[in-house]
Amino acid sequence: VELDYCGICPWDVRAFRGLASGIQYPRLLGHEAAGRVTRIGEAVRSVSVGQAVVVNFIVQCGTCPACRRGLMNVCQRPTYGRGGFAEAVTVPETNVFPFNPKTSPQAAAFTEPLSCVLRGERMLDIQPGETALVIGAGPIGLMHIQVARLFGARVLAADLRPERLEMARQMGAEVVINPGEQSLKDAVLAATDGWGADAAAVTVGSARLVEETLPTLARGGRMNIFAGIYPKEPVSLDPNLIHYRELRVLGSSDSTPADFRQALALIDQGQAQVLPLISHLLPLERLTEGMEIVKAAQGLKVMIDLHA
């Protein structure tokens, strides 16, 4: 696959800095990529040369207990292909997903992160008319807002940056909250007539935000810890609050092939607005600069143009 674009994920930055667990070096990073098929093996039947595709760089074994239970996203014996910060990669047929040639390859490159968002939001089991709270209005949070709305939720979004809160409004958040200016819990209760959020996605890797989000939940509420916390921090949650309100605390990690296909369909059909999330488009030789931009949380999505 000759690659056109590859987005930079915060995980790439952690791995680049040597902070991601389970990584063997040297390692070519990048896993949010789109391109075109240039060569195929003799046994390949599902794709053809010239076809526009997105790539899933994690190859699940398909035979471990997790895979056999349908939890391919947490495969116990995954292998990692060569990353997307490259001009071309070789991947198994099962790990490429064709997309509509009318779809921008920049938009298609959002398939992997959107597939993870879809999985997290699906685990929250949002019902039409419920209130969903999204903590963090970076690129991932902005996709959570859109998916929660697609599931029929009224969305509240919280972030410390006014420009990100404005983007959250543009993506469909009905209420935006700056926790630096007001109590998160009080703001959520005020926006829900004292009921609280039926579902919440914590898209920022912060123990404090996990702790502060739990009390915003309504009875029967669900919280998805979407982001890993690095360096690791202990989290203190009130077990009585979880017990008496029948709360559910959930984690989600990566995505399954089914999530991948659904995310790509949302992009192909224009139901997920991802192009407005690109704030920086850089050539490959400025990859290190792009990593620093993501590390500093400047702008939104930093994407590498592999032909610039």
Annotate the PLM regions:
Residues 124, 166, 171-247:
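Glycine-rich cofactor phosphate-binding loops and adjacent beta1-alpha1 units
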Residues 19, 161, 229, 255:
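Residues in the short beta-alpha loop(s) of Rossmann-like NAD(P)-binding domains
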Residues 130, 221-222, 300:
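Glycine-centered, small-residue-biased loops immediately flanking beta-strands
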